[in-house]
């Protein structure tokens, strides 16, 4: 019975060859060409770069004898630490490199007995370098790049990309909600400014709340406290502010106040708005329009918008055609000469 079990025991003692002399070269075998994605074992106990370097995904390694023998060693002597078949990227190359170094140190007799410490150091280094690389590349990655990406957590376990994205989801959701609130606040301020601070020196903004409309308007509810509600869509598709229908009593009071004072203070505006049951914005816009019309009347150009002749034109005396202009000039010259 002992003779039957002796060849497997011999194979367990010397799994990598039949040579009696032990060396690192016999462990490694014929080393393959170093692929650009893997860590290359250089004979040191640990290959630790100072900065986390994001390496390109490794090509499929050639099926060589050394890797097959390494995996056989791994399955026979080191069951609790298999090489994870990761889908590629920086994490897979990092994990494979760490697994290779840990298995090599575990199979070396004597000198490297504390392989568990190196495994813990490898796990910690993998987690730290991974978190650093993730913080650097998080700004450049878009949300649409959801591939089969895995991450190593602090405990050494592999976390899929979707789980880490779900953990980051509430933070990003709060940021989106805050940006949405800011955008809504800016939109309200812009609409308020567009309604209140128009260019009242031009004629296009003069609405029906001008002074000289003494005819009675249909009494609609003039209480439009929100200036954002004053905008509706006309048939042409343009957003246009709805004109406020003032009553004759409101127009009369506004005219009286305007003749007394062209510019109102904030307290006066609030008092007038409270008495006339209007909003302060409506009183402000009415006074701005009224001042613009008053300045145009003062300048002598009332209806320049429609192209009609003004109501108070400058008096121009035309010269009749049948009058000889030379005779008029000669008469003026004679009169000037007759003066002393």
Curated annotation (Swiss-Prot):
Q: Does the keyword tRNA-binding apply?
A: no
Q: Name one GO cellular component term.
A: nucleus
* Keyword Transcription among record annotations: yes
What S-S linkages are listed for this chain?
A: none
**In what ranges is there compositional bias, type Low complexity?**
65-76, 220-236
Instruction: Report keywords, A-Z.
Output: DNA-binding, Homeobox, Nucleus, Transcription, Transcription regulation
Annotated GO biological process? regulation of nervous system development; regulation of transcription by RNA polymerase II
Where in the sequence does UniProt note compositional bias of the Basic and acidic residues kind?
A: 174-191
A GO molecular function held by the record: DNA-binding transcription factor activity, RNA polymerase II-specific
* A Pfam family the protein falls into: Homeodomain
Location(s) in or outside the cell: Nucleus
Q: Which CDD domains match?
A: homeodomain
Disordered, as annotated region: 58-81, 154-196, 211-243
Which sequence positions fall in the DNA-binding region?
A: 239-298
Q: Which InterPro entries match?
A: GBX-1/2, HD, HD_metazoa, Homeobox_CS, Homeodomain-like_sf
Function of the molecule: May act as a transcription factor for cell pluripotency and differentiation in the embryo.
| Record protein name field | Homeobox protein GBX-2
Q: Which organism is it from?
A: Xenopus laevis
């Amino acid at each position: 019975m002992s003779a039957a079990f002796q060849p497997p025991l011999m194979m367990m003692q010397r799994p990598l060859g039949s040579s009696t002399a032990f060396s690192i070269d016999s462990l490694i075998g014929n080393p393959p060409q170093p692929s650009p994605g893997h860590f290359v074992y250089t004979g040191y106990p640990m290959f630790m770069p100072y900065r986390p370097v994001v390496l390109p995904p490794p090509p499929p390694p050639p099926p060589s004898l050394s890797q097959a023998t390494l995996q056989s060693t791994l399955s026979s002597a080191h069951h609790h630490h298999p090489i994870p078949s990761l889908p590629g990227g920086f994490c897979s190359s990092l994990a494979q490199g760490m697994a290779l170094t840990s298995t090599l140190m575990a199979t070396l007799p004597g000198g490297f007995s504390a392989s568990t410490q190196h495994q813990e150091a490898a796990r910690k280094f993998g987690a730290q370098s991974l978190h650093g690389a993730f913080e650097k590349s998080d700004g450049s990655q878009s949300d649409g790049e959801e591939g089969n990406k895995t991450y190593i957590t602090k405990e050494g376990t592999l976390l899929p990309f979707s789980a880490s994205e779900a953990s980051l989801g509430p933070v990003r959701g709060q940021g989106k909600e805050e940006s949405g609130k800011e955008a809504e606040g800016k939109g309200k301020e812009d609409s308020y400014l567009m309604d209140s601070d128009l260019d009242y020196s031009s004629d296009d903004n003069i609405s029906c709340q001008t002074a000289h409309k003494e005819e009675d308007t249909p009494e609609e509810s003039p209480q439009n406290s929100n200036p954002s509600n004053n905008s509706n869509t006309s048939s042409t598709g343009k957003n246009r502010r709805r004109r406020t229908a003032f009553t004759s009593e409101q127009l009369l009071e506004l005219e009286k106040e305007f003749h007394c004072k062209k510019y109102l203070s904030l307290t006066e505006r609030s008092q007038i708005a409270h008495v006339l049951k209007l909003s302060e914005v409506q009183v402000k816009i009415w006074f701005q329009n009224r001042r613009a019309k008053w300045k145009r009347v003062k300048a002598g150009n009332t209806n320049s918008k429609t192209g009609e002749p003004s109501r108070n034109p400058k008096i121009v005396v035309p010269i009749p055609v049948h009058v000889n202009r030379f005779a008029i000039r000669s008469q003026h010259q004679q009169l000037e000469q007759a003066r002393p």
